[in-house]
Amino acid sequence: MNDTRNEIIRIGNELVRSVGYNAFSYADIAKALNIKNAAIHYYFPSKSDLGVEIIERNIKAFNELTNHWKSLNYKEQY
């Protein structure tokens, strides 16, 4: 996957966690990465597209961390 795209997602994720989804803009990401807003729009035409990607990656990471729990017995899970 493209490094710029991954960096946009990484910074977006950091901003969601630190200031919240509604409190950051593409300009904040562009400034952090020293790129133009248009570069972000190339990968994510709307902020909601970026938000969905961030959520999907977090869900995937959570599932990867917790998948092994299914093989544990009830007491080991807790």
Stretches found by the model and what they are:
Residues 7, 11, 15-49, 53:
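Helix-turn-helix
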Residues 1-3:
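N-terminal intrinsically disordered/low-complexity leader segments
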Residues 56-63:
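Short, basic, alpha-helical segments at the C-terminal edge of helix-turn-helix-like DNA-binding modules
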